[in-house]
């Protein structure tokens, strides 16, 4: 059965090059890459709380998302903040996260991908396993559509852009031009502080029969 646990759980994300060292100082569980590889999940004891740690990131750096009963939110936040001082921990908001994820070309559902975009057009074919053995319920929903697009070619594709002029800003929905002709529009834009210029993601039209690998 399914139930809505939105109001029952809190979440804090610890991300960055020092995230493992910081989190390891709060728990006895081995957080090495060998023990907890990318996309793994485990329960951790942090102080007086048990958290569910997801080894995942949305900023292009090492990171974890910690989920816990909502009543432990303040306790865990204060514990992480006090411990994080020795690791130069800083709080960041969504604009910071957005800048980092666009530099890494991570797609955002609602901007770069929607339920109307094809997984291959979005450059996410690597997460679709067409050679996976079917379960007792058959293949996944959309299997036939993916196979068809794989052979017919992509209609559009996501590309990443970096402006060479550091004084110009990108937001989203700016036209993408080639030789004076509009060939697409940006779906996301921000300033890339690591790259030193505005960065964006956007769809451009594909040539006939162009595949995801072309």
Predicted feature residues:
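Conserved, structured C-terminal
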Residues: 1-214
